[in-house]
């Protein structure tokens, strides 16, 4: 069973409070989501494999450590997931970036896939699937289905806010996936929004309604 981890670092929690506030404007929301994503990436990447490398410092030769093999692929679920990409790239600038496009039917709350574009070597990379919200879990499940179908196996799901319903659904469908979130909230409301949540992350990131 993959692990479920709430990242409770004080800076993450402080910044999460900023973006939860309904008075947080688009510019601030976007900037702080970027900052939270960088902080979360530090913990999510903790188990990346290392290998020895012989180098020479100004003083002496030594055996140092470097990342081993293929590195990370970041795969945002469009459109809100885009807001988390740059923050992770600041920490892992060599990462490749794929995209999976989803939209949610407002009546059924079911996700529909409309676009998939991934690095050709996705099966050799550690994949961070990013989406600010894990609500019903439908989009996350479908995105991970698409990744596994194309050969990915080392997958982590990273979100800012999650609902118990979404966590349960994702763990039941993909029990091998590690889930990282900045907060586990109370529940979903009748419209499929996380309560207390932070509203529609995509609209708040891009200034749309």
Swiss-Prot record:
Enzyme Commission identifier(s): 2.4.2.9
Query: Which note does the record give on the cofactor?
Result: Binds 1 Mg(2+) ion per subunit. The magnesium is bound as Mg-PRPP.
Residues holding uracil: 194, 199-201
Q: Which UniProt keywords apply?
A: Allosteric enzyme, Glycosyltransferase, GTP-binding, Magnesium, Nucleotide-binding, Transferase
The record lists 5-phospho-alpha-D-ribose 1-diphosphate as bound by 79, 104, 131-139, 200
- What is the stated purpose of this protein? Catalyzes the conversion of uracil and 5-phospho-alpha-D-ribose 1-diphosphate (PRPP) to UMP and diphosphate.
PANTHER family named in the record: ADENINE PHOSPHORIBOSYLTRANSFERASE (PTHR32315), URACIL PHOSPHORIBOSYLTRANSFERASE, CHLOROPLASTIC (PTHR32315:SF4)
Extract the InterPro entries matched here: PRibTrfase_dom, PRTase-like, Upp_B, UPRTase/APRTase, Ura_phspho_trans
Q: Which GO terms describe its biological process?
A: UMP salvage; uracil salvage
Q: What class of enzyme is it?
A: transferase
Q: Which GO terms describe its molecular function?
A: GTP binding; magnesium ion binding; uracil phosphoribosyltransferase activity
This protein's pathway: Pyrimidine metabolism; UMP biosynthesis via salvage pathway; UMP from uracil: step 1/1
Q: Show which residues constitute the signal peptide.
A: none
- Cofactor(s) this protein requires: Mg(2+)
Magnesium: present as a keyword of the record? yes
Activity regulation (record text): Allosterically activated by GTP.
Protein name as it appears in the record = Uracil phosphoribosyltransferase
Give the record's family classification: Belongs to the UPRTase family.
Reactions accelerated catalytically: UMP + diphosphate = 5-phospho-alpha-D-ribose 1-diphosphate + uracil
Instruction: Give the gene symbol.
Output: upp
């Amino acid at each position: 069973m993959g692990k479920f981890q709430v990242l409770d670092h004080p800076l993450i929690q402080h910044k999460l409070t900023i973006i939860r506030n309904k008075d947080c404007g688009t510019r601030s929301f976007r900037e702080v989501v970027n900052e939270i994503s960088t902080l979360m990436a530090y913990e999510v990447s903790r188990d990346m494999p290392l290998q020895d490398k012989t180098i020479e410092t100004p003083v002496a030769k030594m055996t140092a450590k470097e990342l081993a093999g293929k590195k990370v692929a970041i795969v945002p679920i469009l459109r809100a997931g885009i807001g988390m990409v740059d923050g992770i790239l600041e920490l892992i600038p060599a990462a490749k970036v794929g995209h999976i496009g989803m939209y949610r039917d407002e009546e059924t709350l079911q996700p529909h896939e409309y676009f998939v574009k991934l690095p050709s070597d996705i099966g050799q990379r550690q994949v961070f699937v990013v989406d600010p919200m894990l609500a019903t879990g439908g989009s996350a499940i479908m995105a991970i289905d698409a990744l596994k179908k194309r050969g990915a196996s080392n997958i982590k799901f990273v979100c800012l806010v999650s609902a118990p319903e979404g966590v349960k659904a994702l763990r039941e469908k993909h029990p091998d996936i590690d889930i990282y979130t900045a907060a586990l909230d109370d529940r979903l409301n009748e419209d499929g929004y996380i309560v207390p949540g932070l509203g529609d992350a995509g609209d708040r990131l891009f200034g749309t309604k």
